[in-house]
């Protein structure tokens, strides 16, 4: 049994290069798939809440951050009145998203995400391309993770009735579906840092450093 365990460890110890390749393939799949989905209106509609609340990106949308009064009499950002559930269609809300530049922004973001995924993958063959992709990937994941701070919808907000009933799922650390989607970028960030180190070492070796 001991020899079998040692053999397993010997095999596992030699998986580093395979691991690098798998991380590159994983980032390619995730980024190209998600980037491609940015050309679908339902996906574009879903990112508005993140962008509209970001101090770094909200200027890219025309109307999303405007304050309006909801039918309930609450002052909210305009995008809140134009949210469309996945699989649903509302022509008036779709027209608002066109006016808001939602789809234009989403298409540009999709192209950028796809390009980053491809560059990271190509780092398997060219460390300079990989380095560029990994730096961009790290910047993008930091931007995505910032949504946990800027997006109210990333956290559960229990109603007064729920709180009165003893419901404890309210605020930190209780992530909504949107927040759970964002937090996964921590793993992508870690993988990109590992690949950045690999690309940097390969470039230094080529330079004879």
Language-model regions, residue ranges each:
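Membrane-interface extramembranous regions
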Residues: 1-209
